[in-house]
Amino acid sequence: MFVQGLFLVATLLTAQLETTFTVEYNGKKYEFHITDQDLQKGPAWPANQQNPPLSARRAIDAARNELATLLPNGKDWRLYEVTLRPIDDHWVYLVQFLEPLKGDGGGQQLSSGFQVVVLMNGTAVMPRVSP
């Protein structure tokens, strides 16, 4: 219940070689499209390399900056989770935040989530926003 309104859909569109992560928040749809070209611009994470090319801390910073530009109160959101997701031979970070806590009148705290996608070159993916 604390993460209501978050819908994540990951779809691989093979004809276009594109992966899309979708978040719905506050009546809007945010589609994070990642093309094969986007992935190729950044470093791969070879199986023989212990750590990813981009640190989790740098991915979090990039995601925080992107969230602050996307949402009016984005700078106030709390970090919830950082996930590594493989896409073919490359990886991306999925950085999830929870909005600032708000009461529902009954003393219970409700919070929605929002996820930002970060490439291994440190670039946060800018979403397409639609109503």
Predicted features and spans:
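Short, non-transmembrane alpha-helical segments in secretory-pathway proteins
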Residues: 45-82
